[in-house]
């Protein structure tokens, strides 16, 4: 499942999982590779629900330069959401994940 941080989808999703241990992480995940997958699987092992915050294209350009991202937001989100270990992908629009973390209020934040 993919939601935008600004659309209220995080709150609706979390209401479906009371009493579950929520794990959160975030990143650009521009060219997803085996190391990313292992990292996400390890994060998921820490709890019940893994929520991944995903930087939008504009924030990646600010962080990494005008030639990034290589893959567009929609493709990056879809690939992440297809992973068995990922329960929710949340697109956020800032360079840093502060608002994402505040919205999710995870039991554990993995970075």
Predicted segments with their positions:
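Nucleotidyltransferase catalytic core that binds NTPs
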Residues: 1-111
